[in-house]
């Protein structure tokens, strides 16, 4: 096919290809190539097809021969004398006799150009000639938009002009065609304008890597990598995009979610030009009186371009140009802003300081900028301060200057009361970091500080996990959280009691049936082991008792709820409560820990010791005390009857020493056994009664101060509706206080000794 015809078909095809590429998202290198081809096509289209012979088209296939431009100069040979004989009016001499061409065998290897390629190049292959600068060699940039055969030409290769260009003979003297200014001037004279156009068409925004996410800038109005101002005057380069009436900031072009999302329809934008005070062109975004974002731009033109886009975004859709009213507040001029700030500085509070970089006001920023002494000291502080120290100083200043909100105070108070949170050392990247840990809904949350509970660093779902104490002899109070025998987290407590407390809480939250006593402890001595196990058992029992009621702690014993009766037993009056309270022994300050008291379902609704809780406890203990006293009177009556019968049998044995003596003795032995059993029942009732009286006294001690009032009901309903206290001891769980009391057997011994002594004295009086 004729070469000119191919070029005629190639130009419109390239034009259509470029129009299709205008609607595609291209990388920077591809965009540069496209603009270069477009400029070449624009310069070629007005010319007729026969005048496009100066276009550089490299027909070499896989670098197997010279380019098309080189082949043009291969047979260009003339004598200098023929050039002198040319007339001034432009007539050329027709009798130019070129020097005969040397045979290939006589030519040197360096003078012989490589042969022309036999097969045409691929359709998507082209070569672009860039303009020559002073002291530079011609630069050829080749590109493949599609698939190419093996050993394809790599993008951006360079050809050495001195070695690759063919030689030109003038007057019998061999010269390189590259140095022939007359021959090359016609080919390079028009590239100065194209060079300026290429500089103007270069893309402004450079992506840092090829794998950068291009979908971030899809359908956006404008995008660029801008500097965003952080706290303490630090700057960070972020990808800034305006899309769908929002300004989005990404920390990296690979991010999927924006780091900051700012609606422009509710913001005020102020442009601060670069001057002696401001080292950069800045755009300041504010919401109300709070400055939320500061961006730095490279030039005034770039700032005006961004302001133009922001005005277009804030402009109402479909409004007339003369009647347009922006939805966002008007973009203020810097001079007007300075006047307004000078008035606001007098009323600004000097103690106000935000918790983060988006909470400082415009007036505070301008006031700080005017204070040169503060600015210099802050600049020195920035140079010597690390990021961690900066965050700590911010928290300290904010804590001392800013008033805490009421809900934050309530959160802190509840966190202090509950044992399900505290500081732990966490192993992160082979280093220990202190974190505020919190248990909630079977999940362990890690916070940077106890004041920052709204965001957490990490969270671990505890269901299905295991806990294993020990992490080497250097960390005796460390323990590990395992899931499927894989370490999920390594934590370290500050002391043995803290370690035991966390172990008990974690075991309950994990739903494990293992108790703290069953765990295997290494690297601790016997004393420390006892402390860990004791604290672990206490927290384990506590967490079991109030597993579903975080974070309110319980005070009294936790027992299973009884069935709520349809008819509540009558409660005694307030006068009866006072009478019974005064009759309680003041010497009994300690109760038997083995005595368990049933908790009615109605009293389980209150979790803190308030007015309702005191009233419910007083009623329950009073009813229990009266029931025990009634049962005690019944046993005492039965015991008196048995002793009377025993006394009569002994008198009968004394009076009748005959044949019935053996039967009478057996009857007396049977009565003795019955009396001993009744006496044991009476002693148990005495112990229970002492414990109930003590707890009644404790509830009444807190009740009157809270306005306690106890209603009364009849004793007949009390006897019919109140169940018997025949619940076995094993079915009633107790809290950690009762378990601690179990460790002092002297309490039980002293109570039993007094009761037995009183019972013996009472028996001696009766007999």
Curated annotation (Swiss-Prot):
Tell me where in this chain the PH domain is found. Answer: 219-315, 417-511
Record PTM Phosphoserine, positions in chain: 87, 93, 97, 103, 152, 328, 342, 746
What is one GO cellular-component annotation here? podosome
Q: Which Gene3D superfamilies does the UniProt entry name for this protein?
A: Pleckstrin-homology domain (PH domain)/Phosphotyrosine-binding domain (PTB)
**Can you name the source organism?**
Rattus norvegicus
Where would you find this protein in the cell? Cytoplasm; Cell projection, Podosome; Cell projection, Invadopodium
Renumbered residue ranges of the record's region Disordered:
83-145, 164-210, 341-381, 563-605, 704-767
InterPro entries, per the entry: AFAP, PH-like_dom_sf, PH_domain
Q: How does it assemble?
A: Interacts with CTTN.
- Listed PANTHER family: ACTIN FILAMENT-ASSOCIATED PROTEIN 1 FAMILY MEMBER, ACTIN FILAMENT-ASSOCIATED PROTEIN 1-LIKE 1
| Task of the protein | May be involved in podosome and invadosome formation.
Q: Which domain of life is it from?
A: Eukaryota
Keyword Iron among UniProt keywords: no
Keywords (alphabetical) are: Cell junction, Cell projection, Coiled coil, Cytoplasm, Phosphoprotein, Repeat
Q: Where is the composition biased (Polar residues)?
A: 164-173, 349-362, 709-733
Q: What is the designated name of this protein?
A: Actin filament-associated protein 1-like 1
Q: Which residues form a coiled coil?
A: 610-700
Q: Which residues carry this modification: Phosphotyrosine?
A: 556
